[in-house]
């Protein structure tokens, strides 16, 4: 809230004092209680706003001496990479201002990032992020904090262990085959030998099917039907609309319940989505629990694995549902965005497209051979694909930035940081910094992830792990990072093996023309990614 509760209580106290003790002596209070309260509270509001918006940030800020980006202020949705680049990123901490001169620190030095990552239960996500995303993602691992997050991570990390992810490769490949065949059918139906697809939509459909099958053992048929109920729900609430931005801004200044009660279309969509998603998760959880009680829960999906862990089987139903909604929402959205950017970079770097096609066809079974599946061992034998996807994740991280706030007064690189200061971690910008990646940091180069041009190099040559933040580090690192890499490898391999892919609009051949939705849940092409796909025989 913009005006602290204590300020309003002080106003009430002052009002009572003036009205009942000085009623006849002061003209201002002759209008009695309500008018006096309004006059005093308006004056206090004005003084508080003057202090908060102008005096404190402009005259009394502890950050006045820090370097600033050229414009010093951005709209909420602006990509912080621009500000960091203009504000001499190498210094490590940059001062900027947000809405109503709200102070921000953009942090990029390895020591500051290490402190934020290792002391992550002191540096928490701002409440505004939780209020914006909580209805869709649920209060799971992505949004919970401190002891609650620590307990959840301890419980739900084991089901994402590599041995369980390896068991899911047949599911990843089966759905990759299905979406490839579906796209091929649409191309053949045109009779033109090629077709134009909005890759972001197709990536979201296959990612949703993969995540529901892999995590809950249920196929919702999004690949077969773009209007499948669950697909429509996520398509609606995860679109980067102005309504979502308006709600996010309002929740910074007004109670969340009040904002959610406003008659806005985005509110209605998010409310309906909340009920639908949680209802689906609740039904599937109860179905799995019934199977567990009957001693015939044998699936390899994540939920089945979770329930076979005794510690998780006894967890409250609502907590498990929170984790399921988090996995569904955050998982399928970020992975589909990663796939979308991978296809974009294949269109821009057609030499790599040809190299990857050759590797895929030599390693993986054709999608036409339904009885054969890809395995984790197959993917590990594709160093070019692994290098390419890792560079895509560096170049276009699905979450291009994140924010933190310290719970207590602290220091970063010797700079005093009061509690509640908004700290921006510009993931996309850090991933491209020369201090971490060398002189070719701002060049898309999958070869940095290769040794001798054929052996995969998992470090990519980065000088510090804090120079590569696509999956973060420390207690808040992504528990499903290997899941995401495996799914991306399967889908991209199936597409590049079967299709020749190129942009349908040459305007986007220049990356500067590709605007991204950096103010939403993820950073994806704002206007979609339309790609012309042509079926290539021989696989």
From Swiss-Prot:
Pfam families named in the record: p450
Pathway membership, UniProt: Mycotoxin biosynthesis
Keyword Iron: yes
Residues engaged in binding heme: 478
One of the GO BP terms on file: antibiotic biosynthetic process
SUPFAM superfamilies recorded: Cytochrome P450
UniProt keyword terms in alphabetical order: Antibiotic biosynthesis, Glycoprotein, Heme, Iron, Metal-binding, Monooxygenase, Oxidoreductase, Signal
Residues the record marks as carrying a glycan: 120, 520
Cofactor(s) recorded in Swiss-Prot or TrEMBL: heme
Family to which this protein belongs: Belongs to the cytochrome P450 family.
Protein name as it appears in the record: Cytochrome P450 monooxygenase buaD
């Amino acid at each position: 809230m913009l005006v602290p509760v204590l300020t309003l209580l002080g106003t009430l106290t002052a009002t009572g004092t003036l009205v009942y003790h000085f009623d006849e002596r002061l003209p201002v209070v002759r209008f009695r209680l309500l008018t006096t309260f309004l006059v005093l509270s308006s004056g206090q509001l004005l003084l508080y706003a003057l202090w908060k918006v102008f005096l404190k940030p402009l005259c009394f800020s502890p950050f006045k001496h820090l370097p600033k980006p050229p414009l010093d202020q951005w709209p909420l949705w602006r990509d912080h990479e621009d500000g960091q680049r203009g504000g001499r990123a190498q210094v490590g901490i940059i001062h900027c201002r947000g809405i109503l001169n709200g102070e921000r620190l953009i942090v990029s030095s390895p020591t500051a990032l290490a402190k934020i990552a290792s002391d992550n239960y002191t540096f928490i996500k701002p409440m505004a992020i939780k209020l914006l995303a909580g209805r869709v993602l649920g209060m799971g691992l992505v949004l919970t904090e401190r002891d609650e997050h620590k307990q959840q991570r301890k419980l739900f990390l084991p089901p994402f262990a590599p041995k369980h992810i390896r068991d899911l490769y047949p599911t990843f490949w089966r759905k990759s085959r299905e979406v490839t065949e579906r796209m091929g059918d649409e191309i053949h139906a045109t009779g033109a030998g090629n077709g134009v697809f909005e890759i972001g939509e197709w990536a979201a459909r296959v990612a949703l099917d993969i995540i529901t099958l892999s995590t809950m053992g249920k196929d919702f048929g999004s690949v077969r039907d773009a209007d499948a109920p669950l697909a429509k729900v996520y398509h609606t609430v995860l679109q980067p609309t102005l309504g979502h931005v308006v709600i996010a801004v309002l929740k910074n200044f007004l109670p969340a319940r009040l904002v959610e009660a406003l008659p806005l279309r985005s509110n209605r969509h998010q409310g309906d989505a909340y009920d639908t998603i949680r209802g689906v998760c609740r039904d599937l959880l109860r179905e799995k629990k019934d199977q567990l009680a009957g001693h015939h829960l044998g699936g390899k999906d994540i939920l089945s694995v979770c329930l076979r862990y005794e510690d998780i089987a006894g967890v409250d139903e609502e907590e498990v549902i929170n984790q399921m909604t988090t996995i569904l929402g955050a998982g399928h959205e970020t992975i589909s965005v990663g796939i979308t950017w991978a296809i974009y970079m294949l269109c821009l770097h057609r030499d790599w497209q040809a190299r990857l096609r050759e590797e895929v066809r030599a390693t993986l079974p054709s999608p036409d051979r339904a009885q054969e599946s890809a395995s984790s061992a197959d993917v590990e034998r594709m160093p070019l694909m692994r290098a390419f996807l890792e560079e895509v994740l560096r170049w276009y991280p699905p979450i291009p930035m994140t924010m933190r706030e310290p719970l207590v007064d602290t220091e970063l690189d010797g700079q005093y940081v009061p509690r509640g200061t908004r700290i921006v971690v510009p993931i996309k910008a850090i991933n491209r910094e020369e201090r971490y990646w060398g002189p070719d940091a701002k060049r898309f180069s999958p070869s940095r992830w290769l040794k001798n041009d054929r052996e995969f190099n998992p470090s990519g040559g980065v000088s510090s792990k804090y120079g590569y933040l696509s999956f973060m580090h420390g207690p808040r690192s992504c528990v499903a990072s290997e899941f995401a890499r495996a799914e991306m490898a399967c889908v991209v391999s199936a597409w590049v093996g079967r299709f020749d892919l190129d942009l349908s609009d040459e305007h986007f051949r220049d990356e500067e023309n590709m605007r991204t939705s950096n103010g939403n849940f993820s950073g994806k092409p704002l206007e979609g990614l339309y790609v012309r796909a042509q079926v290539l025989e021989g696989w």
